[in-house]
Amino acid sequence: REVSLEVPATVYSAEGVSAGETTVAIDGSVKILGDRSFEGQFAIHEVETTCREGVHANIRWDAMWTGAQDILFYRAGEFCTLGVERMLYITENMQSFGLRLEDGTIITTDEAYVPLLMSGYYYSIRPIFSNQF
């Protein structure tokens, strides 16, 4: 299925203090049968290198083990190291996520991800948020 979103997020310092706002442009396709994954643009406005022409992302759910999500950025013919750590937390609808940059900066849609990302350990969880109350 095709996905096209502009998701607001909060930027936190490595110490977990709110440091501003950003947006993430998500545009691509999600594969839900077999290995669940996303291929396309995941442009974090706070991280200029992720917004460059030709840079795409591959996000996998249940990546290295059940409940683990990861992200890899690439350009035609090469993987890119853009200062974004490989592991992240992201829901399958892609509207809720948390990730950490290599300098410790945290970018997240929900403050609940901050302590998880500050710990430096990635827990096997399946972050699912329902719109049903």
Question: Where are each of the predicted segments found?
Answer:
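Extracytoplasmic/periplasmic/luminal assembly and interaction segments
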Residues: 17-69
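Extracellular/lumenal and peripheral-membrane lipid-interaction modules
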Residues: 14, 33, 106
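Alpha-helical transmembrane signal-anchor/signal-peptide segments
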Residues: 1-14
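Non-cytosolic head/periplasmic domains of membrane-anchored proteins
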Residues: 52-133
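Short, solvent-exposed secondary-structure boundary motifs
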Residues: 14-19, 78-80
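A mature extracytoplasmic/lumenal domain signature
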Residues: 11, 46-48, 129
